A protein has these predicted regions:
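N-terminal segment of the mature soluble domain
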Residues: 56-57, 61-160, 183-187, 191-200
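Extracellular loop and loop/strand-boundary signature of outer-membrane beta-barrel proteins
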Residues: 137, 172-176
Length: 270
């Protein structure tokens, strides 16, 4: 009877393995081409009321990872950073999109060196090939300057803030589930260029959840002469990059509402 029960359990687990393998192949085969990555909070960004007045010119020089954290890994040393090293792109995108693109005019400062080199190349070319024109070489338009600078960065990444799971094993057959929660913290501050005063400062936090479930069997049959071993499972991990972007967008939204409360600006219609 026990042997029959073991065979039934083994068959069930092997059937589950086949299902997992088929689903894995489906994920690979149906991955599809590259696609645009949409905002985690498009409705929240769009729901911000428009600015009462002209767009605010703002500069972002960088938004760096100040945590120094590495990706969590079991039993090995991992030199990969836990969070993105290019989060300023999400800051710029959030500033451009918030309030249906009615709030900020972002000027290029992250690639300032490249911009200056290109402008210098244009000047040199015009000096050579347009010097005979009646009015001389065509001058370049002046670059926009910003009244505000957005500073800040990723200041915290805490691993295993919450860890848990459950499992059971009977006669060499077991199943288990596990979960883990990490958090990422983002800080932003708005600085006045004319005075150097920090006008606003906000901090936002986003959780990053991971979940794993699986089953396994380890059993000897026929008086210990035959070994049956099998394992199956799957895991779901929330993308860290997506969580960082969500925290950044929440910070931009909070800056706008705090600025309105401190009467730095007004919403349209007020």
């Amino acid at each position: 009877m026990i042997k029959l029960l073991s065979v039934i359990i083994i068959a069930s687990i092997l059937s589950g393995c086949t299902g997992v393998m088929e689903r894995s192949l489906d994920v690979v085969n149906n991955a599809g081409p590259a696609r645009l990555q949409n905002s985690p909070n498009p409705e929240r960004l769009d729901d911000v009321p428009p600015l009462n007045g002209q767009k605010i010119t703002i500069a972002v020089y960088g938004f760096i990872d100040k945590t120094g954290q590495r990706k969590p890994a079991d039993n090995i040393a991992n030199l990969s950073s836990a969070v993105t090293q290019g989060s300023e792109v999400w800051v710029i995108k959030a500033l451009q999109d918030v309030g249906n693109e009615s709030w900020f005019q972002v000027v290029e400062r992250v690639g300032m060196d490249n911009l200056i080199k290109e402008r210098q190349l244009i000047r040199n070319t015009r000096d050579v090939y347009e010097k005979e024109l009646p009015n001389g070489p065509t001058p370049l338009k002046p670059m926009l300057f910003a009244g505000l600078i957005l500073e800040g960065g990723i200041v915290g990444y805490d691993s295993n803030v919450a860890v848990g799971g459950a499992g059971a094993r009977y006669l060499g057959v077991g199943a288990q589930t596990e979960y883990r929660v990490d958090t990422v913290t983002v800080v932003m501050r708005l600085v006045s260029v004319s005075t150097g005063k920090v006008l606003l400062s906000v901090a936002t936090e986003k959780t990053i959840a991971s979940y794993r479930s699986g089953a396994d069997i380890f059993r000897f049959l026929d008086l210990g002469t035959k070994l049956v071993e099998s394992e199956t499972g799957y895991s779901v991990n929330e993308p860290v990059n997506y969580a960082v972007r969500e925290a950044i967008e929440a910070g931009v939204i909070e800056l706008i509402y705090e600025g309105r409360d401190k009467e730095l600006w007004k919403f349209k219609g007020e």
